[in-house]
């Protein structure tokens, strides 16, 4: 169950079944000797698994009334925590459930806000676990208590007990540089809204509050950006925000650099030949 701003949204049983099957596809699932659903709601996951289920407001007789975050649970090898935690403001409760679960489990499989795909959010997740699998879900994961569907942007992630390092959050400005004044720049890049990621020439009239200002690091890079920027699909990263569609500087370099690398490398090869 996800709880957002004190409203209860329950996971569809069909969705839970599909996600359980994804977890079962891993060899370790067969040796999971303790499975916990920490915020079980109507029991979408626990009713389809042999597991321990908790919820502060259970809607199924097999779910224990308890606050998972306050329970004195100990780590045990072979533990899997699976389900759909409450999200809270900006995913704060979901992160709390992640941290608690990773203290006691080898594997954590949760439906989470799509913002958990962002490197900045993943850096807040304990470094004891690494992301093993993720799948962006359709918007119709939830139903309300009255049975109506509720649309929320979510992702299903499986994390395994395997240490990792934090992501670097510094944009790699190898091809272009983010600047503060448009007088020093070549392009605008839309930061928010439906057209997030769109490139415009600096001569166009744009608002700095909704755009990044970018200077290409060479004339050839500027030409490549003008010709090929439209090939970049910004849909996935723009939808990973908590609120309105938006992209970060890191999103831009992560998306644009591989394309520019390929184009400029091919250009050099053509010149050599």
Regions found by a protein language model. Name each.
Residues 1-273:
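Class I S-adenosyl-L-methionine-dependent methyltransferase catalytic core
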């Amino acid at each position: 169950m996800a709880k957002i701003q004190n409203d209860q949204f329950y996971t569809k049983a069909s969705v839970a079944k599909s996600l359980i099957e994804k977890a079962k596809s891993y060899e370790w699932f067969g040796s999971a000797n303790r499975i916990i659903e920490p915020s079980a709601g109507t029991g979408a996951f626990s009713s389809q698994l042999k597991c321990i289920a908790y919820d502060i407001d259970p809607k199924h007789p097999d779910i224990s009334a308890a606050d998972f975050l306050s329970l004195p649970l100990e780590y045990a090898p072979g533990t899997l925590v699976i389900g759909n935690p409450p999200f809270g403001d900006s995913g704060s409760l979901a992160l709390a459930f992640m941290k608690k679960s990773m203290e006691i489990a080898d594997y954590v499989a949760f439906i989470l806000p799509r913002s958990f795909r962002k490197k900045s959010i993943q850096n807040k997740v304990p470094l004891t676990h690494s992301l093993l699998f993720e799948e962006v879900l359709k918007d119709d994961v939830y139903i309300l208590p009255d049975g109506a569907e509720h649309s929320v942007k979510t992702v299903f992630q499986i994390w395994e007990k395997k240490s990792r390092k934090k992501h670097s959050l510094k944009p790699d400005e190898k091809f272009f540089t983010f600047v503060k004044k448009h007088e020093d720049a070549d392009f605008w890049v839309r930061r928010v809204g439906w057209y997030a990621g769109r490139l415009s020439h600096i001569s166009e009239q744009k608002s700095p509050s909704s755009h990044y200002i970018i200077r290409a690091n060479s004339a050839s890079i500027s030409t490549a950006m003008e010709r090929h920027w439209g090939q970049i699909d910004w849909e996935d990263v723009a939808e990973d925000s908590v609120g309105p569609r938006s992209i970060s500087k890191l999103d831009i370099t992560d998306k644009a650099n591989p394309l520019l690398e390929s184009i400029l490398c091919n250009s050099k090869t053509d010149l050599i030949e």
